């Protein structure tokens, strides 16, 4: 919501929200709708419209569905040349790096890939939450983010705190990696 608030002061901004169909996804959708109505921001909403295939990671399925919707929006004439700004932050970078490292890759989230821009990658989630509180910008945390049966959530709640005990400067190190990483252009 912080990124939307920053951008909502500009003209010609539209918000794209994707409802993953989780228990509290409707609550998030309502919050985004209200915010966009209050700030006169155009809103496009996508929703999961099929069941995930068996033997497929639910997280991967949700991500694929979300980006498929983004691409559908991006292919409409009105939005064809418009960049998409996602709200990934530094905590996501650390989690993704650990996640991909466990799978033998160790990749960072790129700050730019094709039409997708991620300007908040060097900013901690707590800083964004604090900013939202101070500026009375509403946001909602999806309760499914606490479910450690999902690998990324396990990393977030179990591995990252342990890594911080060993190296309290991990976010500083990762911020430097983000700031020095090359931009990926598709």
Stretches found by the model and what they are:
Residues 149-186:
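ATP/NTP-dependent adenylation/nucleotidyl-transfer catalytic domains that generate, transfer
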Residues 1-157:
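Core alpha/beta nucleotide-donor-binding catalytic domains of modification enzymes
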């Amino acid at each position: 919501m912080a990124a939307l608030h920053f951008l909502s002061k500009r003209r010609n901004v539209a918000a794209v929200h994707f409802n993953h169909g989780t228990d509290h996804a409707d609550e998030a959708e309502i919050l985004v709708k209200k915010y966009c109505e209050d700030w006169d921001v155009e809103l496009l909403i996508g929703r999961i419209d099929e069941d995930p295939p068996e033997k497929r990671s639910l997280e991967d399925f949700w991500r694929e569905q979300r980006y498929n919707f983004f691409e559908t929006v991006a292919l409409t004439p009105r939005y064809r040349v418009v960049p998409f700004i996602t709200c990934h932050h530094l905590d996501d970078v650390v989690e993704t790096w650990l996640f991909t490292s466990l799978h033998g890759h160790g990749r960072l989230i790129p700050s730019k890939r094709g039409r997708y821009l991620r300007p908040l990658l060097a900013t901690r989630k707590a800083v964004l939450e604090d900013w939202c509180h101070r500026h009375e910008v509403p946001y909602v945390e999806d309760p499914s983010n606490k479910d450690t049966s999902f690998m990324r959530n396990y990393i977030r709640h179990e591995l990252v705190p342990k890594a911080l005990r060993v190296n309290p400067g991990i976010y500083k190190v990762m911020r430097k990696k983000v700031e020095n990483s090359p931009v990926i252009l598709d």
